[in-house]
Regions:
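Sec-type signal peptide cleavage vicinity
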Residues: 2-397, 402-405, 409-411, 417, ...
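C-terminal, surface-exposed recognition/capping segments
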Residues: 406-537
Length: 537
């Protein structure tokens, strides 16, 4: 992810500042936004019980924003509130019915006893006393901020009397922070996909409720349910609309006009995990691409440009082996050769090819060396660095395995999802290559196997660095690709002591993980790969 920050002031010339990441733009204040009392303009309402709050053409702090120009607009249904002489929070009697650059609000109440008054913008869903940054936000078109009012945007100001005029002026200051997501990709597979939502999780609350204190006028904060996560939906639910499927991902570089998505969050220092939900409408596969951002101070009245390269992790097709074979399962018939018909390596679940090793004259055939009751470890280079059976048991039984049903990845030219998070060996207490968790060396005295359940809760943001991810890469049986996206089997370097047909392997699915040798036929085309390739380092 590109990590630069630019700060723009809309009341001054462009300034830039290189810092950690993102782009920050400060919302300009409404320095020329006036409150006019008892207007004498014959075209205006002269009702003595109403005060006119004028939002003029020159103002730049309205409630929606044009990213490129910095212009702001009042939106349909935007009301303001003003605390009057009696200390009552008064709601304007009118609001725009469309997107406008200027609007004249009418507010009931008394505004004669003071030279200043407190002004509030509390969003569109307010009860008149509070506003909440929503945990579910929705944007129906790219580069559009009309949803700010329902997402929890709010602002405050002090209106002060203009000397020599029967008017009040105020500067509206927006209080939340704003994230502007701009995903892009050079992956041609993803170019045919759509962004359907952006899910942001934090190590602390990023959604909150703010209530106007009737005594002090301050906005008192209180927590909301599930305030550590906000989900922004990025599609138009109207059937047949241009954004019905979501926002396009056709851009090779950041483009706010192509898929810019805006989220309102509570200001503060947050460590964020951003999950971009991407859908291939042709195959109906929908999943996530995850980015984790370091702790950063997100300031109020500021927006941050969150550019993200969505180049998903790609896994090769070259690490499937029969147990301890000299060459990989499809050596000479690799999918990259694009052989005709079913000659070469199958790349889709359920497809088969007859060109797999079928006897020990083939270098792709398994090692069939065996002596009853004697430990036998793999001897070929491709198996030298993979975990032995003891280590596999530590991962399965003590690695706190957690299934991730949504993280996207590619292999052999196709998009898949599904995999498991396991603790890195550094964070597994007692981890040993010489003994399993039960204290026994399974290389010399092993049994059939052991299983463990799998959690469906992802590692927390604070702990995610302690885990690595194994994709559900499936396996090959008799030349056919099985269960890719649903399960995976990884060979250990240890053979079964009691049956010449078997070797130990780790296997997992969405509900279970286990290590065993029963049904671990050496002729299976399981994955043989060191776990450091997947981030266990």
């Amino acid at each position: 992810m590109k990590k630069t920050m630019k700060q723009h002031s809309f009341t001054a010339r462009l300034k830039s500042l290189a810092v950690v990441f993102g782009i920050a733009m400060v919302f300009a204040s409404c320095a020329n936004e006036d409150v006019a009392q008892n207007s004498t303009n014959p075209n205006e309402d002269n009702d003595k019980n109403l005060t006119t709050f004028v939002a003029g053409d020159e103002t730049k702090t309205r409630t929606s924003m044009d990213y490129n120009s910095g212009n702001f607009y009042w939106e349909d249904g935007d009301y303001i509130y003003v605390k009057d002489d009696d200390g009552v929070l008064r709601k304007s009697t009118n609001a725009p019915d469309q997107k406008v650059a200027a609007f004249k609000y009418k507010v009931p109440g008394k505004f004669a006893a003071s030279s200043s008054y407190k002004v509030y913008y509390l969003g569109k869903n307010s009860d008149g006393t509070s506003v909440s940054i929503s945990t579910t936000q929705s944007q129906t078109a790219p580069d559009n901020t009309a949803h700010f009012g329902t997402a929890g945007d709010y602002g405050t100001a002090t209106a002060t009397k203009v000397t020599g005029k029967n008017q009040f002026k105020f500067e509206l200051e927006h209080q939340p922070a704003y994230l502007v997501f701009q995903p892009y990709t050079s992956n041609t597979i993803l170019h045919n996909c759509y962004l359907t939502k952006v899910e942001v999780s934090s190590d602390n609350d990023i959604a909150e409720k703010y209530t106007v204190n009737p005594t002090t006028g301050a906005l008192d904060a209180s927590t909301v349910t599930n305030g550590k996560q906000i989900v922004l939906t990025t599609r138009d639910p109207t059937w047949g609309s241009s954004n019905y499927n979501g926002f396009p991902l056709t851009n090779n570089s950041a483009s706010v006009t192509t898929n810019g998505a805006y989220m309102v969050i509570k200001p503060g220092t947050h460590t964020l995990r951003v999950r971009y939900w991407v859908k291939d409408v042709a195959t109906n596969v929908e999943g996530t691409i995850t980015k984790t951002l370091p702790a950063t101070a997100y300031a109020s009245n500021t927006y941050y440009d969150m550019t993200a390269n969505l180049n998903v992790k790609d896994y090769d097709g070259d690490h499937y082996y029969m147990w301890d074979a000299q060459q990989q399962y499809w050596y000479g018939y690799e999918w990259t050769k694009h052989l005709p018909g079913n000659t070469g390596q199958p790349t889709l679940r359920g497809y088969t090819s007859p060109n797999y090793a079928q006897n020990n004259t083939d270098s792709r055939y398994y090692n069939d060396a065996y002596t009853y009751g004697i430990a036998h470890s793999a001897t070929h280079a491709s198996f030298n660095s993979i975990p032995n059976v003891n280590e596999m048991l530590w991962y399965a039984l003590k690695g706190d395995p957690r299934w991730d049903n949504d993280e996207l990845w590619t292999t052999m030219g196709h998009l898949y999802k599904g995999g498991i998070w396991i603790k890195k060996k550094t964070y597994i207490n007692g981890y040993s290559a010489n003994k399993a968790p039960d204290g026994i060396d399974w290389q010399t005295n092993g049994s059939i196997g052991q299983n463990a359940s799998v959690s469906r809760v992802l590692p927390s943001i604070a702990d995610i660095g302690n885990y690595f991810y194994l994709p559900a890469l499936g396996s090959y049986t008799s030349g056919g690709l099985n269960l890719i996206g649903f399960s995976a089997s990884f060979w250990s370097s240890s053979a079964d002591l009691w049956d010449r047909r078997y070797a130990y392997y780790l296997t997992f699915s969405s509900h279970q993980i286990g290590v065993g040798c029963n049904y671990g036929y050496r002729y299976l085309g399981n994955r043989a790969q060191k776990f450091s390739d997947f981030g266990d380092n």
